[in-house]
Regions:
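Ribosome-associated RNA-binding proteins
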Residues: 2-216
Protein backbone atom coordinates (compact mmCIF):
# COMPACT_ATOMS: atom_id res chain seq x y z
CA UNK A 1 0.00 0.00 0.00
CA UNK A 2 2.84 2.39 0.86
CA UNK A 3 4.38 2.04 -2.60
CA UNK A 4 1.03 2.64 -4.32
CA UNK A 5 0.34 5.76 -2.24
CA UNK A 6 3.84 7.15 -2.81
CA UNK A 7 3.54 6.62 -6.57
CA UNK A 8 0.14 8.33 -6.67
CA UNK A 9 -1.78 5.20 -7.68
CA UNK A 10 -4.00 5.51 -4.59
CA UNK A 11 -5.14 9.10 -4.06
CA UNK A 12 -7.95 8.67 -1.53
CA UNK A 13 -8.06 6.89 1.81
CA UNK A 14 -11.59 5.74 0.94
CA UNK A 15 -10.04 3.34 -1.62
CA UNK A 16 -8.21 1.64 1.25
CA UNK A 17 -11.35 1.44 3.40
CA UNK A 18 -13.45 0.04 0.53
CA UNK A 19 -11.31 -3.11 0.43
CA UNK A 20 -10.56 -3.23 4.20
CA UNK A 21 -6.82 -3.08 3.59
CA UNK A 22 -4.59 -2.71 6.68
CA UNK A 23 -2.63 0.53 7.12
CA UNK A 24 0.81 -0.37 8.48
CA UNK A 25 2.70 2.88 7.91
CA UNK A 26 1.74 6.27 9.43
CA UNK A 27 3.21 8.04 6.39
CA UNK A 28 0.30 6.68 4.32
CA UNK A 29 -2.15 8.66 6.47
CA UNK A 30 0.11 11.75 6.40
CA UNK A 31 -0.02 11.69 2.60
CA UNK A 32 -3.76 11.05 2.19
CA UNK A 33 -5.01 13.13 5.16
CA UNK A 34 -2.61 16.08 5.47
CA UNK A 35 -5.04 18.13 7.60
CA UNK A 36 -5.08 15.70 10.56
CA UNK A 37 -5.10 17.28 14.01
CA UNK A 38 -3.63 15.69 17.13
CA UNK A 39 -5.03 15.86 20.66
CA UNK A 40 -3.47 14.38 23.81
CA UNK A 41 -6.32 12.77 25.75
CA UNK A 42 -4.50 11.55 28.85
CA UNK A 43 -1.00 10.93 30.20
CA UNK A 44 -0.48 8.99 33.43
CA UNK A 45 2.28 6.96 35.12
CA UNK A 46 2.15 3.16 35.24
CA UNK A 47 4.31 0.98 37.48
CA UNK A 48 5.69 -2.51 37.20
CA UNK A 49 7.19 -4.41 40.12
CA UNK A 50 10.62 -5.91 39.34
CA UNK A 51 13.36 -7.48 41.44
CA UNK A 52 15.17 -4.13 41.44
CA UNK A 53 12.09 -2.29 42.68
CA UNK A 54 9.26 -0.44 41.02
CA UNK A 55 9.74 0.54 37.40
CA UNK A 56 7.77 3.64 36.44
CA UNK A 57 6.82 4.46 32.87
CA UNK A 58 4.31 6.82 31.28
CA UNK A 59 1.28 5.87 29.20
CA UNK A 60 -0.28 8.31 26.76
CA UNK A 61 -3.60 8.26 24.91
CA UNK A 62 -3.65 10.41 21.76
CA UNK A 63 -6.50 10.97 19.28
CA UNK A 64 -6.10 12.22 15.71
CA UNK A 65 -8.81 13.41 13.34
CA UNK A 66 -9.62 15.83 10.54
CA UNK A 67 -13.02 16.95 11.95
CA UNK A 68 -14.52 15.60 8.74
CA UNK A 69 -15.34 11.95 9.27
CA UNK A 70 -11.94 10.40 10.06
CA UNK A 71 -10.62 9.66 13.55
CA UNK A 72 -7.97 7.46 15.14
CA UNK A 73 -6.92 6.55 18.67
CA UNK A 74 -3.58 5.27 19.92
CA UNK A 75 -1.84 4.52 23.20
CA UNK A 76 1.82 3.97 24.01
CA UNK A 77 4.03 3.36 27.06
CA UNK A 78 7.52 4.85 27.30
CA UNK A 79 10.09 5.93 29.85
CA UNK A 80 9.49 9.60 29.04
CA UNK A 81 6.28 11.53 28.43
CA UNK A 82 7.46 12.94 25.08
CA UNK A 83 8.35 9.48 23.79
CA UNK A 84 4.98 8.07 24.86
CA UNK A 85 3.11 10.88 23.08
CA UNK A 86 5.15 10.48 19.88
CA UNK A 87 4.57 6.73 19.85
CA UNK A 88 0.85 7.13 20.54
CA UNK A 89 0.52 9.56 17.61
CA UNK A 90 2.02 6.97 15.23
CA UNK A 91 -0.30 4.24 16.54
CA UNK A 92 -3.31 6.59 16.26
CA UNK A 93 -2.52 7.42 12.63
CA UNK A 94 -2.35 3.73 11.72
CA UNK A 95 -5.74 3.14 13.39
CA UNK A 96 -7.63 5.93 11.57
CA UNK A 97 -11.16 4.79 10.67
CA UNK A 98 -14.04 6.43 8.79
CA UNK A 99 -16.99 7.75 10.80
CA UNK A 100 -20.44 7.68 9.25
CA UNK A 101 -22.46 10.80 9.95
CA UNK A 102 -26.09 11.60 9.31
CA UNK A 103 -29.08 13.74 10.27
CA UNK A 104 -31.63 14.04 13.04
CA UNK A 105 -35.04 14.43 11.44
CA UNK A 106 -34.97 15.93 7.93
CA UNK A 107 -31.98 15.69 5.60
CA UNK A 108 -31.39 19.44 5.34
CA UNK A 109 -27.94 21.00 5.37
CA UNK A 110 -24.70 19.22 6.16
CA UNK A 111 -24.42 16.00 8.15
CA UNK A 112 -24.08 16.85 11.83
CA UNK A 113 -24.73 13.82 14.07
CA UNK A 114 -24.55 10.03 14.19
CA UNK A 115 -27.18 8.42 11.90
CA UNK A 116 -28.45 5.89 14.50
CA UNK A 117 -27.84 4.91 18.12
CA UNK A 118 -24.52 3.08 18.45
CA UNK A 119 -22.81 1.52 21.45
CA UNK A 120 -19.16 0.77 22.11
CA UNK A 121 -17.66 -1.14 24.99
CA UNK A 122 -14.28 -1.65 26.60
CA UNK A 123 -13.87 -3.46 29.89
CA UNK A 124 -16.81 -2.56 32.10
CA UNK A 125 -17.49 0.73 30.30
CA UNK A 126 -20.34 1.11 27.81
CA UNK A 127 -20.68 4.34 25.82
CA UNK A 128 -23.83 4.97 23.79
CA UNK A 129 -24.08 7.69 21.15
CA UNK A 130 -27.59 8.99 20.44
CA UNK A 131 -28.53 11.30 17.52
CA UNK A 132 -29.39 14.86 18.56
CA UNK A 133 -31.14 17.76 16.78
CA UNK A 134 -29.09 20.48 15.15
CA UNK A 135 -27.82 23.06 17.63
CA UNK A 136 -27.71 20.70 20.61
CA UNK A 137 -23.93 20.45 20.70
CA UNK A 138 -21.93 17.54 22.09
CA UNK A 139 -23.42 16.43 25.41
CA UNK A 140 -20.50 14.43 26.82
CA UNK A 141 -17.62 14.54 29.26
CA UNK A 142 -14.72 16.86 28.32
CA UNK A 143 -12.45 14.02 27.14
CA UNK A 144 -15.10 12.32 24.99
CA UNK A 145 -16.06 15.72 23.59
CA UNK A 146 -12.51 16.11 22.21
CA UNK A 147 -12.72 12.72 20.46
CA UNK A 148 -16.18 13.39 18.99
CA UNK A 149 -15.08 16.83 17.76
CA UNK A 150 -12.10 15.31 15.95
CA UNK A 151 -14.49 12.83 14.32
CA UNK A 152 -16.60 15.68 12.90
CA UNK A 153 -19.67 15.14 15.10
CA UNK A 154 -21.40 18.45 15.91
CA UNK A 155 -24.51 17.31 17.82
CA UNK A 156 -24.89 14.13 19.88
CA UNK A 157 -26.16 12.85 23.21
CA UNK A 158 -24.00 10.35 25.09
CA UNK A 159 -24.76 7.83 27.81
CA UNK A 160 -22.05 5.93 29.67
CA UNK A 161 -22.20 3.06 32.16
CA UNK A 162 -19.64 1.12 34.14
CA UNK A 163 -16.40 2.26 35.74
CA UNK A 164 -16.10 5.42 33.65
CA UNK A 165 -13.46 6.78 36.00
CA UNK A 166 -11.05 4.50 34.12
CA UNK A 167 -10.55 7.14 31.47
CA UNK A 168 -8.65 4.91 29.04
CA UNK A 169 -11.54 2.46 28.80
CA UNK A 170 -14.04 5.31 28.35
CA UNK A 171 -12.02 6.70 25.43
CA UNK A 172 -11.69 3.25 23.83
CA UNK A 173 -15.42 2.58 24.25
CA UNK A 174 -16.30 5.87 22.55
CA UNK A 175 -13.88 5.09 19.70
CA UNK A 176 -15.47 1.63 19.32
CA UNK A 177 -18.91 3.27 19.09
CA UNK A 178 -17.67 5.57 16.31
CA UNK A 179 -16.27 2.55 14.44
CA UNK A 180 -19.65 0.82 14.68
CA UNK A 181 -21.29 3.55 12.59
CA UNK A 182 -20.07 1.62 9.51
CA UNK A 183 -20.90 -1.85 10.86
CA UNK A 184 -24.42 -2.03 9.40
CA UNK A 185 -26.21 -1.48 6.09
CA UNK A 186 -29.12 0.88 5.54
CA UNK A 187 -31.32 0.80 2.41
CA UNK A 188 -29.46 3.71 0.77
CA UNK A 189 -26.32 1.50 0.71
CA UNK A 190 -27.94 -1.61 -0.76
CA UNK A 191 -27.42 -0.66 -4.40
CA UNK A 192 -23.79 0.43 -3.92
CA UNK A 193 -21.97 -2.81 -4.68
CA UNK A 194 -18.22 -2.67 -5.24
CA UNK A 195 -17.22 -4.22 -8.58
CA UNK A 196 -13.69 -2.84 -8.73
CA UNK A 197 -10.62 -4.97 -8.39
CA UNK A 198 -8.56 -4.81 -5.24
CA UNK A 199 -5.59 -2.39 -5.69
CA UNK A 200 -3.11 -5.27 -5.45
CA UNK A 201 -4.68 -6.79 -8.60
CA UNK A 202 -5.17 -3.51 -10.47
CA UNK A 203 -1.54 -2.49 -10.05
CA UNK A 204 0.10 -5.92 -10.27
CA UNK A 205 2.50 -4.80 -13.01
CA UNK A 206 3.67 -1.84 -10.96
CA UNK A 207 4.13 -3.87 -7.77
CA UNK A 208 5.98 -6.66 -9.58
CA UNK A 209 8.78 -4.28 -10.59
CA UNK A 210 11.85 -4.62 -8.43
CA UNK A 211 12.71 -1.58 -6.37
CA UNK A 212 16.24 -0.43 -7.07
CA UNK A 213 18.21 0.58 -4.02
CA UNK A 214 19.50 4.14 -4.06
CA UNK A 215 23.24 4.50 -4.36
CA UNK A 216 24.92 7.22 -2.38
Amino acid sequence: IGRLVKAGKITSIEEIYTFSLPIKEPEIVDKLLPELKEEVMQVFPVQKQTTAGQRTRFKAFVAVGDCNGHVGLGSKCAKEVAGAIRGAILVAKMSVVPVRRGYWGDNAGNVHTVPVKVTGKCGSVRVRLIPAPRGTGIVASPVLKKLLTLAGIDDVYTSSRGHTRTLGNSIKACFAALKHTYSYYTPNFWHNTCTEQIPYQRFTDFLSKEMKAKEY
